[in-house]
Structures are given as C-alpha cells and as structure tokens.
C-alpha cells in the first residue's frame, strides 16, 4: 500500500494536540498549596460527608487534603492567612489550620445527618447545633456574609435574626457560586504565617422578648423543666444515656482545647467562664477544685521547705570546703618555710 501524506483531519488533530499540550504547559501545577480543583481531577471535601460538586474546591497535594470553599469559609474555628480582599476571588487558607479544623470536626456530630465532621456551628453562643455546610443548607440554616470584611456566619433556622448588622442575609438553600456559570482559570491560595480571624467570635446574642410577665416566665421555666426531665427519662429507657453523656464530655473536651489554644481571645475566656461558673451543676466541682488548690499550695510550700534545706546544706558544704582549702594552704606554707 502506498504511503499517503497525513489527511486533513489528522493534521487538525495534530494541531489540536499541540495546542492542548501548550495550554497544559502554561497551567501551573499544584505545589503543595490549596488550589481550585480542575474538573478532571476528582477531589473529595474533607469537611463534607459526601462529594458534592457545588462549591469551589481547594486542595493541598502534599497533604492529600481537599475541601470546598464554603466548608472552609464557614467552619467555626478556621482562619485565613491574609486579610480579605473583596477584589480578589482567591482565598488564603493555612494548611495546618485546615488540618487542625478537620481534627476538631472528628469529635463533632452533625445535627442534621448525625455523622462526625460537623465544623459549621450556629453562631449563637448558647446554641449547640453543629453542621456540615451542606447539611446546614438542607436544614434551612441562614447564611450571613459581609463581603467588605470577609465575615461569614451561619445561624440555625431557630436562631436566625434578621435584625443584625451584617448586610447580606439569605438562606443557605439559595446560595450559589458564580464559578459554575462562567469559565475560570486555576487559582492559587497562598500560605503565610500571618493569620486573621474572620470575626466569628463576635457572636450575636438573640435576646428573648422582655414583654412576658413574671408569672408566665415562671410557668415557662417549669414547663421547660418538665420537658427536659421527660427527655432524660426517655433517653434512659432507650439506653441512650451513655451516648448523651459522651456528647457532653466531647463538648467539655473541646472547651478545654479551646482554652489551651495560644490564640484564645478574651471574649472566649469570658464566654466559657460564664457558661461554666454560672451553671449550678458544677458547684460541687468548684468546691472540690478549691480543695485541689489548697493541696497544690501545700505541696508547693513543702517543695520550698525542701529546697531551703538543700540550699542550707550546700552552703554549709561550701563553707566546709573553703575552710579545708584554707587550712591546707596554711599547712603547705609552714612546711615550705
């Protein structure tokens, strides 16, 4: 068979391949930082219970971590490593901070689906609801975002307060991203040592109406106590008391970790102190802790007494040694003369 020159379609395919190869050479490869994932590279969000293709995805190749942009932005304890710039669509997430948030989420169960990894908490300080971001969406939680300052908050449907100081308030079910309606180039997220809180610690307190009469308030508290008592009885009957107290212990452990963090804010100390010390449940605990303080004082005084005796012994030894050396020097002088 005679060898024929390349046909027109084959030439076209060759040109297309060359153009595609050149385009791939231009696109920067991931270098261990979070980057918007390409469509052909499947990445699973580390903060979601399942892979949902409805948010910008960042990933760190060196750590094998991927997370949706919204899961990062609305996670309660996560910070960005640079000041927010409204004119720049890129986000700045510190890899170590993301790893720490993933670890924190392993202890938190989602209010909606019951699975671990729920790092998005209701911003009302007295509310203990935690979600995965998309579970919060399914539970009709309300998103509050301020594009000028880069503040992102989530309130559960029960505690959503339209009278707040954030300009953008909308249900999570109505949140969409422009990244899927237009072509976007791969974007990088940089990493630096400068971290900035996104303002989640400035929680908004939803105050109950003060128009209720005192009698109604007492009746309400009594009814609330009856409901809670019935809840505990049903937990006991269902064999779920261990699970309930496991959740309580997990919460206390998280509070301890929060206090041990070097970046703990003054508002966090105030919030945790109020929650712990205003609860009658811990009155006996505080009394016992006072005894522990007294015991620590006693042990410290005992160590101080022992140190004093040790210092006196060393000083006496030093004086004896000096006297011995002086006597030896005098004897040597007498012999030489």
UniProtKB/Swiss-Prot annotation:
Pfam families documented for this protein: zf-HC5HC2H (PF13771)
Coiled-coil ranges from the UniProt annotation: none
GO MF, one annotated term: zinc ion binding
GO terms under cellular component: nucleus
Keywords, comma-separated and alphabetical: Activator, Metal-binding, Nucleus, Transcription, Transcription regulation, Zinc, Zinc-finger
InterPro entries listed in its UniProt record: EPHD, PHD-type_Zinc_Finger, Znf_PHD, Znf_RING/FYVE/PHD
KW Metal-binding (keyword) present: yes
Zinc finger extent (C2HC pre-PHD-type): 42-78
Zinc finger map (PHD-type): 108-160
Zinc-finger is among the record's keywords: yes
Localization per record: Nucleus
Gene3D superfamilies: Zinc/RING finger domain, C3HC4 (zinc finger)
Principal place of residence: nucleus
Tree of life domain: Eukaryota
Subunit (UniProt): Interacts with BRCA1 and RELA.
Function: Positive regulator of Th1-type cytokine gene expression.
Protein name, per record: PHD finger protein 11
The species this protein was found in: Bos taurus
